[in-house]
Curated annotation (Swiss-Prot):
Protein name: Venom peptide 2a
Residues that bear Leucine amide: 62
Organism: Eumenes pomiformis
GO BP term (any one): defense response to bacterium
UniProt tissue specificity: Expressed by the venom gland.
C-alpha cells in the first residue's frame, strides 16, 4: 500500500509542477462584469440580513 501511495503522491507533485510552469493565456477573456459598481446586481438587497436587528430581537426575546 505504501508503494501505491508514493506513486499517487509523485503524480500529484509532477502535475503540480507542470501546472505551475504552464504559461498563462496571452490575452485572457475579460470578466463578464469587471466593475461591480458599474452594474450592480438588481437582486442584491443590502438590508436583507440585518445583524443588529437580529441581535436585538434575540436579546428582547431572552430578556
Amino acid at each position: 500500500m505504501r508503494g501505491t501511495s508514493f506513486i499517487l503522491f509523485a503524480v500529484v507533485v509532477i502535475l503540480g509542477f507542470l501546472n505551475a510552469n504552464a504559461e498563462p493565456l496571452a490575452n485572457p477573456a475579460p470578466l463578464a462584469n469587471p466593475d461591480p459598481l458599474a452594474n450592480p446586481d438588481p437582486l442584491a438587497n443590502p438590508e436583507a440580513f440585518d445583524l443588529l436587528g437580529l441581535v436585538k430581537k434575540v436579546a428582547s426575546a431572552l430578556g
